Design a protein with these regions (language model features):
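Periplasmic/ER-lumenal interhelical loops and adjacent helix-loop junctions
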Residues: 1-81, 88-89, 95-105, 112-117, ...
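Contiguous transmembrane helix-bundle modules in multi-pass membrane proteins
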Residues: 83-100, 106-226
Length: 226
């Protein structure tokens, strides 16, 4: 009480004490945020618009997420709860009230949606889980997942404003991941290990180049600017 009461009284003298809950309104189109999942999209360094976010975590997720949903050996309840959490977090990126709650009942400033790492972590965890469980008998779910990944890309091109370079490289990477995952699913032993290394190399190349491009677009690569 000796610590909490002075802290409470002190907070009541700040500007935050006079704020009220924002309305449950949307910042804009959800497709503008889905766009940030794509390769070579410009990351946010500092932005006054509260609806921006950084959620890029690899093109492979476009395929593995659907493979995860179609895989029968992953429990239905696990799929449902993980998808619900993903949807709630993603909706929170675009909703003023939910965003306010995620930021500890506080308005965000400068770097919006700082809790996006939770979305990235869960998405990658789901993708990793299904990748580790793939077996030869899962080839149908893998092929359907790949088809869904391409369908998602086609839909995104109609809803999002994607640059030609982003679209081209996304198609290339999805195709590369599709080939690797089919091979990974159908093979065993040494060949499966080799394909897993190829898959790892493709992922590293993609994310490394995207990271370099991201730093370059924000002006942190040129030493003369320090």
């Amino acid at each position: 009480a000796f610590l909490l009461i002075p802290a409470y009284l002190g907070l009541n003298t700040t500007a935050s004490a006079n704020r009220v809950f924002p309305k449950a309104e949307w910042y804009g189109s959800i497709w503008d945020q889905i766009k940030q999942l794509f390769y070579l999209t410009k990351p946010i360094k500092n932005q006054q618009f509260d609806g921006g976010l950084n959620i890029y975590c690899g093109t492979i997720c476009f395929v593995l997420l659907f493979v995860y949903l179609l895989n029968r050996r992953i429990k239905l309840w696990d799929k449902v709860k993980n998808v619900i959490i993903l949807v709630v977090i993603f909706a929170s990126f675009n909703n003023q009230l939910l965003n306010y709650i995620w930021h500890g009942f506080h308005d965000q400033y400068g770097i919006p949606n700082r809790f996006s790492f939770l979305f990235i972590f869960l998405l990658l965890a789901m993708c990793c889980e299904v990748l580790m469980k793939l077996q030869k008998k899962d080839i149908l779910s893998v092929m359907l997942g790949i088809a869904c990944g391409y369908a998602f890309l086609i839909l995104a091109t109609k809803k999002c404003t994607l640059e030609k370079e982003t679209l081209l490289w996304t198609e290339i990477f999805i195709t590369a991941y599709a080939v690797c995952m089919v091979g990974f699913t159908l093979t065993k032993g040494m060949w499966k290990r080799i394909i897993s290394y190829v898959l790892l190399i493709v992922c590293l190349v993609e994310t490394t180049i995207n990271g370099i491009k991201g730093y370059d677009s924000n002006g942190y690569v040129d030493i003369s600017q320090y």
